């Protein structure tokens, strides 16, 4: 393999010329398309990054709004529970007061009825005792009785009262 310097230089010039011609042709016909494709790709990546950032920001805002709404709901729920407890306590006190008042009123009415019934019973008993006393006295006075006859008369009268 004897290659001369002339052949090496010739091959070098041919390869260099071919390379320069290839670079020229690529620049003339394909370079614009390649740069356009790369620019489009760079723009798409940039747009995707911007879209992802906007979506992340929107998600964060939505999460914050939901958290704020949840906190507001919790505060409102606590307020409603407290109001319900206060209302229940007020109602409880009112109901207990009404029940105590009603019980006192019923007790006073019952005591009044008992006293009235007692007075009526005493009046009735007094009348009956007076009638009995008068009847016994008239029977005793109408007859002159000895002890035995008097006892027998009283027993007979008591028996008549028991039958009536």
Curated annotation (Swiss-Prot):
It is found in: Cell membrane. This is ATP synthase subunit b. Belongs to the ATPase B chain family. Keywords: ATP synthesis, Cell membrane, CF(0), Hydrogen ion transport, Ion transport, Membrane, Transmembrane, Transmembrane helix, Transport. GO terms for cellular component: plasma membrane; proton-transporting ATP synthase complex. The keyword Cell membrane applies. The chain crosses the membrane at residues 6-26.
